[in-house]
Amino acid sequence: MDFVDFDSFSNDEITGEDNLPHPQPALSLPITSNIETIGKRISSLNTITRSLLKFEGTDEEEGESSSENASKENELAQKYAQMSLNFLKKEETQHGSDGKIANGVDGKSYNDFEHSKATLSTRLSRVLNDSLSETLLREIFSHLEDKYSSYDDSIDELIEPGVVGSMSRKKLRGKVENELIKNQSLVLKEYQPVIKQLKVVEDRLSKLNDLNKVTNDNIENKFKYSSEFNTKVKELNSEKRLINLKKNLLINFKAKFTLNEYEEFVLDSGDINDEFFTVLKKAEEINANCSILLSIENPQLGLKIMSKSNHLINRSVERIINFTNKTLSNLYSLNSKARLRTLHQCMRYLKNKLNYFSNVVNTFVDSRAKVLVDDFLSQIQGNLDSNGNVSTFKRRSSSISSETSSRPIYVSAHDPIRFIGDLLAYVHSLVVNESDTIISIFTFETSESEVEKKEFETIIKDIIDKILKSLVKPVKSKVTQIISAETKLSTSYSIFNLVELYSMMFTKQLSDTSEVSIALKSLVKASQDRLASIISNRLASIRTSNSAQLELNLDLQPPEWIIEFYSDLLPILDQTTTDTIFNFTAEENEEFMKLLVDEPIEIFFEHIGSNKIFESKKDQLILKHNFLDLILSKLLPITIVSDKVIEINEMINTLTQELTQLQLEAILKECGLYDYYNIVNMICPFSDDFFDTSIYEPIKENQLYNKSELLKINEIIQSYIPNALLDIQSSLLKLNPPSIVNEVTTNASLEFVKYYGKLSQINSAFLQETFTWSDFEIATLLGVDEDYTEFIKLVANSG
């Protein structure tokens, strides 16, 4: 706490009548932060003082730690009290008689006063603005209050402004300071052992400091002598590092941008092996790294190095190309694994240079293609001997590994099947041998990656296709010539089978997109077209042939040409195992079916129509029926033409219905009922589902419909019907299928009985007259009694 005295007895500066002390003027304290709580703090001053005094009393009982805090507080209080007394003295001096400051007091005293005032303001503001909590301030003042009460002094004397108050405060201050000194002494006693130990340590540290000083002096002296040496060593190390750097730069430059004499010799004249490609790779890297040298100010060095490296690289590439071409032109040299491995390295290198690689491949393809074509032509273009027979000759083997001659191809115009078989077998052997050769040459034992492996598989396929493409034109030309010249259906079919077989073999060996496979497929198509053409030409000649028309006679049997036609064709169809004939497409198969079935039927019907001997429609129907029945019997065992069998059955059913109708009309005419049949049908045709005699009442208006006419008809029926069945069967004797004869006879007779029975009901209704025989009796005489009985039951059940 700061002690502030309100009186001053400094008479040196103040003279006048008023010797009493005056209150200290107001101070401008910067206590804005505590202005709101200052009143509250002053009002609780007594409480704080009492708490402070109590707190001090408690501290005395607690021991040496509390006395130390009290000593510090007393010292601080004494300090601020002295400052307050100084300010009071200056205030008295300022307010002396006659106003010494106003009447010429020197400016120095006034300035000292202002300075003291500012100092006191600062000190007081520090105390009042100290960031102490209210609780702590309360305890401090309470302790102070308790301490004051212990001396039995009046509190009023302590706050008086006069001499008594000043003396009381000084007395209190002395007591507080005395107590503070005691407390501090107790604290200092605690540190006395430590101080003794520190003095011992001080002696030792002094010795160490002396030793350190001596050592430092020695080091400094030595450093002065060695500094020059160190400087020189440093310079030498720097120079050494620079030299090493230059040396490393030169070594690296030489390693990256130059080839030694041996490496140049390897590229220019050395053997092509692993070392050659290693040096070549280094030369290419040097050439690529020269771009760095070209970017400097003087690019001449880079240009010279690039020129030299380019020369070596070009020379090396030429050597690689020459080696590759020479090796591929003499494939016997590939028996050496080392040479084959070197060839693979060359091709792997050239693959990255497409223009060079393409030239090498094209050269190889041209040479192999020429060899294959020469071999093929040597087989085909043989010389005839003096007797005109085809001579045979040995062919040069197209197989690289074969040293023996193969079996020659016999070119014979009388055996085209054997010739084409031998020819295609020879071509297939060429394809297999050439494919194996190319694969063995261009397949690497150890590929660097799957991508490279796939790339060379594509290259192998392309090379094989290009080489074998040379055979396409001569093979296709020769086989097409033989196919076009052949006129026998069986021979053409055998050729077709051969070509189709080898087409599948070539497709399996090569691929669908290879030129050879495409050529064989075109030959298959040509043989298919030739088969269809042979059949079409044969039918065209039959269409215009007079002999074919003359084969038709009154015996109503099918002509011989249709038997001969199917006798050649059906064995071929019977051998077919594919879904379509000759493996045609669906559209082509449909067209061929029309050529096979529809066109012969059309030609036959034209011949019937143009032949005048068949004036009877019944004979025409029987002849057509017999013709279709013959075709049906030929085609029925062959499952591949089942659709056409169904169509022919439908045509036969149509003809059977027409023939049945003609036979019914013949029976009606023989019985004299044909006109009545027409009259009834004009009114309303008979129906098995519904019949009512009232519908036919208009028949009475017809002049022919009377009893006398019916009596005549009854007599005719009685005379004809007993022999009618024999007459019907005799008229159908030339109809070949017995089942059709029975069907026509039964259906015609049954229809007649139905008509007869219904007409009898009409007669009974409108003429009250009926025929002598009933419909069941007529059915019995015609042999259809069972069929008619079933019909009556069926009508009765449906009604």
Curated annotation (Swiss-Prot):
| Keyword terms of this UniProt record | Golgi apparatus, Membrane, Protein transport, Transport
GO BP, sorted A to Z: intra-Golgi vesicle-mediated transport; protein transport
Recorded hits in Pfam families, A to Z, give: COG6_C (PF20653), COG6_N (PF06419)
This protein's membrane topology, according to the annotation, is: Peripheral membrane protein
Q: Which residues form a coiled coil?
A: none
| Alphabetized InterPro entries for the sequence | COG6 (IPR010490), COG6_C (IPR048369), COG6_N (IPR048368)
Q: Where is this protein localized, as stated in its record? A: Golgi apparatus membrane
Name the GO cellular-component terms: Golgi membrane; Golgi transport complex
- UniProt family annotation: Belongs to the COG6 family.
Q: Could you tell me what this protein does?
A: Acts as a component of the peripheral membrane COG complex that is involved in intra-Golgi protein trafficking. COG is located at the cis-Golgi, and regulates tethering of retrograde intra-Golgi vesicles and possibly a number of other membrane trafficking events.
Classification via PANTHER family: COMPONENT OF OLIGOMERIC GOLGI COMPLEX 6, CONSERVED OLIGOMERIC GOLGI COMPLEX SUBUNIT 6
Protein name, entry field? Conserved oligomeric Golgi complex subunit 6
Q: Which organism is it from?
A: Scheffersomyces stipitis (strain ATCC 58785 / CBS 6054 / NBRC 10063 / NRRL Y-11545)
Q: What is the lineage of its organism?
A: Eukaryota, Fungi, Dikarya, Ascomycota, Saccharomycotina
